[in-house]
A protein has these predicted regions:
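Active-site helical microenvironments for divalent-metal-assisted chemistry
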Residues: 2-185
């Protein structure tokens, strides 16, 4: 839904509808970290990061940021996202969704391969997602992840971000700042 000049209320309603849908779909999920915070916190953080980097209103992009894990993690179809929200939102979510039928190593490899071919808007979601995940690794790492595994995740996340063809400069600076904290692990 493209924002009209006096359509802030509709945009807010659309965002809240997406946030509620994401919250309901991810209700049973917790973050992997020791704090086991509700998964919706991650989705809200990704959307907030994208919002801070925008230079214009893009409600669909923010909705896609909120919904970016609904297909991959809880099986919401692209068709359902298109029906409930819009084809644009569904397409953005699809761009950042891994194929769960593949093994984890292949999914990770393909994120690097596909990164430069995604739209600029999808790249914003991708980098914001990586920022959020790295922040979690620093602030509340999963108890069952060794230091080596966390460092490998940081390295892989950097490979994905470095492969992006047009990373948003605000998000790239934020990513670089959190990546530098790798030495703090």
């Amino acid at each position: 839904m493209i924002d009209q000049p006096n359509n802030a209320l509709t945009a807010a309603q659309d965002l809240l509808r997406a946030a509620r849908f994401a919250s309901e779909k991810h209700a049973a999920q917790r973050r992997k970290g020791a704090s086991a915070e509700p998964y919706i916190n991650h989705l809200l953080e990704v959307a907030e990061l994208v919002a801070t980097a925008l230079d214009h209103a893009d409600t669909n992009l923010l909705m896609a940021a909120l919904l970016h894990d609904t297909s991959e993690d809880v099986g919401v179809t692209k068709e359902e996202l298109a029906t409930r929200f819009s084809a644009d939102v569904a397409n953005l979510v699809a761009e950042v969704t891994d194929d769960k039928s593949l093994d984890k190593a292949e999914r990770k490899r393909l994120q690097i391969v596909h990164a430069p071919h995604t739209s600029i808007r999808a790249q914003m979601i991708k980098i914001a997602d990586k920022i959020s995940n790295l922040r979690s690794m620093v602030n509340s790492p999963p108890a069952d992840w060794s230091l080596q595994r966390r460092r490998e995740y940081f390295t892989w996340a950097k490979q994905v971000v470095d492969a992006l063809s047009s990373p948003n400069p605000i998000l790239k600076a934020e990513f670089d700042a959190i990546y530098r904290r790798l030495k703090d692990l």
